[in-house]
Amino acid sequence: MLETIKYSFVLPAYKAKYFREAIDSILNQTYADFELVIVNDASPEDLDSIVNSYDDKRIRYYKNEQNRGGKDLVAQWNHSIAYARGEYLILASDDDEYSPLYLERMDALVDKYPHVNVFRPRVKRINHKGKIVRIEGYQPEYLTKVEYLYAWTNLWIGSGIPFYVFKREALLAIGGFASYPLAWFSDDATVLRLMEPGIVTCNMTLFTFRLSTESISTTQNSKASLSAKLKATKMFCDEHNRIINDYIPQNEEDVLLLSLIKKFFPRMIRKNKVRSQLKISSLATIISTIGDSVKIDGVSLFYVLKCCKYPILNSLKSLVVPKR
């Protein structure tokens, strides 16, 4: 039986372009007690030669016989973490990078807050040319569930599966990463399910998130993709609202923050998810989706947009959908 260690970096791999840089950033950690589990998702690119160029006992390499991520990205994530043996998991990406101090600083916080399930660093975001487009602002080291949701609702902090450290036991207890269509909102939903004891942030910029134009969740521009993402949007809105409505305020500050979250949540969804997706979708795709009266688990496209208070698309409805 393999010995349990403290941390597992799990790297589902498909693209070769930044793959070596991603591996190097993990192996260059100043904290040494970790393994790197690489899962080749039946990539058509030559990942084998890149992995085989490393002589490092911390690497364990697996290959899927068939591609999983193209059909269900979250299923591939959950399949990949099954190979890990660490007490804490980091689901890495094949095009993002970690600072050498990432794990050392995360470990200090893990030891300081043993009851917490989710840890995150401050994040820098770059475009495909490597240019910095955003650096997150400072946050308190520890945030309660409602404090984090308030910060997230105001877009002060973002989400992204690769930069979190997850407590393995807690993650498996909720069935792994949240399964949403095209992994749309899967990162947010997973954190939401795990953060009852709060969330911890390191205010050092320890992770570089590459805003790739090649990911599954960003490249698809079709009616099916738009419908799937709108379905995921409704799923997340329902889950978020249910959790917020069930939350019992602990003090007057919680009461205020909850009221503000309820007020500004639709704006955040509209700005951060719906609008961004509509921006990359062609007008023909949008009109086709509307014209076919696409249903999302029995809920129309316009119901989702209405929940997000998206007036432009509500106006467009009258132009392209005949009255019945």
Which stretches of residues belong to each language-model region?
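Acidic donor-binding segment of Leloir-type glycosyltransferases
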Residues: 27-66
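Short aromatic/hydrophobic "clamp" motif used to bind/position activated sugar donors
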Residues: 89
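Conserved donor NDP-sugar-binding/catalytic core segment of glycosyltransferases
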Residues: 101-135
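Membrane-interface aromatic/basic loop that binds lipid-linked glycans or pyrophosphate carriers
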Residues: 1, 263-324
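The conserved acidic donor/metal-binding loop of glycosyltransferases
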Residues: 93-97, 122
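Short, well-formed alpha-helical segments that are part of the catalytic scaffolds
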Residues: 15-28
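Glycine-rich, basic loop-to-helix element that forms the pyrophosphate-binding segment
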Residues: 65-84
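Conserved nucleotide-sugar donor-binding catalytic segment
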Residues: 9, 143-228
